Regions:
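Flexible hinge/capping segments at coil-to-helix
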Residues: 1-34
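A late-sequence structural motif
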Residues: 95-128
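Conserved SAM-binding loop
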Residues: 31, 60, 78-79
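Short secondary-structure boundary segments
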Residues: 10, 82-85, 106
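Secondary-structure junction motif
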Residues: 28-50, 117
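A ligand-binding cleft/hinge motif common to bilobed small-molecule-binding domains
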Residues: 44, 65-94, 99
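Conserved glycosyltransferase catalytic-site signature
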Residues: 39, 64-65
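Short beta-strand-to-loop elements that line the ligand-binding cleft
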Residues: 53-64
Length: 128
């Protein structure tokens, strides 16, 4: 299981803080594509609080997490992701929403090859 957290720039006012739920809606939200696991988790949590992604000031869908993380590092918005993903980018910081304790299973999907397994093991070591 892995924590699902808010992700922002290390220079963002939310960085390493616990914020009130309504504070997130003034932000530019970066989302993964429809059908992605992280987007589904966020939409489910928002629904549980009678909200949608439409409540954010601005929403942009980006299918590439590296590009998204670069925009977030430049303090252009926020996203929500597994904490292990946030930790793999030194320019990003977590933030927490008061009353949201989101923990989900984190599953790896990879090609069955020696190279893939080696990369997976290296990535898995980041979370330890």
């Amino acid at each position: 299981s892995e924590n699902f957290v808010g992700v922002c720039s290390k220079n963002h006012r939310f960085a390493n803080k616990t914020i009130l739920p309504d504070d997130i809606f003034t932000e530019h939200l970066f989302l993964r594509e429809k059908g992605s696991g992280t987007r589904n988790i966020l939409e489910q949590v928002l629904s549980e609080h009678n909200r949608t992604t439409g409540h954010f000031a601005r929403v942009t869908c980006i299918n590439h997490f590296t590009l998204m993380s670069e925009l977030i590092a430049d303090n252009l918005g926020i996203t929500f992701a597994y904490e292990v993903m946030q930790k793999s980018y030194s320019s990003l910081a977590p933030f927490y929403v008061k009353g949201w304790n989101i923990v989900r299973d984190f599953n790896y999907v990879y090609l069955d090859s020696a190279d893939s397994l080696e990369i997976l093991e290296a990535f898995d070591n980041l979370s330890e």
